[in-house]
Amino acid sequence: MLRTHTCGELRATDEGKKVKLCGWVDRIRDLGGVRFIDLRDRYGETQIVCDVNSEAYSVVDELTRESVVLVEGTVRKRPEGTENPNIETGEIEVVAERIEILSLADPLPFYPGETPKEEMRLKYRYIDLRSERMKRNIILRYRISKIIRDYFDELGFLEIETPFLTRSTPEGARDFLVPSRLRPGKFYALPQSPQLFKQILMISGFDRYFQIVRCFRDEDLRADRQPEFTQVDVEMSFVDVEDVLNVSEGMVSRVFKESSGIDLKVPFDRIPYDDAMEKYGTDKPDRRYGMELRDFGYAFETTEFKVIRNVLNEGGSVKGFIVPGFASEMSRKKGEELMARMKELGLGGLIWFKLDGGITSPHLKHLEKEFRKIAETENMNEGDVCLIAAHTDRNLLNEALGTLRLEIGKEHFSHLAKGFDVLWVVDFPYFEWSEEEERFVARHHPFTMPVLETLGDDYTKVRAKAYDLVINGYEVGGGSIRIHRRDIQEKIFELLGLSEEEAQKKFGFFLEAFRYGVPPHGGIAFGLDRLVSIIAGESSIREVIAFPKTGNGVCLLTGAPAEVDERQLRELRIRIEEG
């Protein structure tokens, strides 16, 4: 080994020891007769002292920041009053006898700890990863992964690898396709999840499986998504919903406790999907901001205000929420901004009033009676604001108000966004309407067990034995009890519009396995990137991934995706069409 110790290891008890340290030159200070180097590695930082009479003193002339050096010297206590309590090695320094330059650094485009634009950070990721922030995040990710592995090992789970090169089963996002050179015209697909393989492992008798696994989705990237991501994949046999939730809560609570000393309240709260949509306008609620959505229909039963009267006559709804202490912010201009936002979200507009020395509103002339009833029924206080909207589509109304609620919360009540709001959303609808495909599709995936009492030809009434884990408004995990009977699986395919021939073509190998003894089973998958980012206090998962892609799916470090050699394309019998 070139070094005897790391840069975060030496203490006052090591005084007098001869040591060798290796690391990066963080800073250089020249005080005339003595020069100081702050030497850094991933373990910490040590102050190096170069006296004017030492061989090391002149070598400092050649050094640049971020050069890599080997230092030989002797540990001594720092003079009294010069200790640095901000670093672990702050009681000592190393008096250098020799410095060897291992690698001289050119001027860097930026230095560790600086925060240039994200594009620059991603292009020179090897520099960015030297920063304390990124080092802390990457080490936290490793520790969380280890905690997860230890937890499942203690419970008798086996970590079993599943294939990366598999077949395309296009249900949901697009697959990344990999052409086969040996089988021209045929393609592998990179897995969006190990879903079918982990179910086959249950059929194979491996009743407790987990895997920390890379997954791939070729989708139009929304904010803070990655084309490749890591999930903690879990599957168990002979279980029902309660068993999966209990094991999951044990894992998540241990991760928070052992990685960061955070105690979560167990069991986690549970909210039915319908309640989440009615109260928060989303199936990923963040309850820290309060401001639950309310049905204000009671105040408008006899209203003559034309816009709302027309909506109610068509069977529509009037809903809204109270924003506490928001009156000073709620000017006419702010009201116009919020109204414009609601129109962007698909509604006709927004009605509002505030309690500011009485009821104030641009709509007061037409709706004073209704406003007074809301203020009284909802126990509004001086300074509160009430936002109201109406629409014939209750789902659209909930979603629009839910979006507005969250935006107001993040912009004006960020001080409430502390701690961790952890909950399960349960009792999901099995199907949802896809505007793009103009048909009903499985909300989770088509291997989810339906609640059999709800299974029929009315898509809107079928419920799924599915569950999502939500932390601070982010979906961190999702899973379900799986179908283990072939007749039920075939019924789901039928409801999805998959003919027997199509089902055999896409999932024949899987359906074949159903003939040979399938245990009841279920599982869940957690997004490791998101879980780590929440614990780390980072708003973007890119901050907890060593080498992430941009929002456009580009690796700025390597330039991927890139063109390939024409010869490679010919071997694969692929021709690129322009346009």
Swiss-Prot record:
GO terms for biological process: aspartyl-tRNA aminoacylation. L-aspartate binds at E171, R217, H444, R482. Its EC number is 6.1.1.23. Keywords: Aminoacyl-tRNA synthetase, ATP-binding, Cytoplasm, Ligase, Nucleotide-binding, Protein biosynthesis. Pfam families: GAD, tRNA-synt_2, tRNA_anti-codon. Aspartyl-tRNA synthetase with relaxed tRNA specificity since it is able to aspartylate not only its cognate tRNA(Asp) but also tRNA(Asn). Reaction proceeds in two steps: L-aspartate is first activated by ATP to form Asp-AMP and then transferred to the acceptor end of tRNA(Asp/Asn). Homodimer. This is Aspartate--tRNA(Asp/Asn) ligase. It comes from Thermotoga maritima (strain ATCC 43589 / DSM 3109 / JCM 10099 / NBRC 100826 / MSB8).
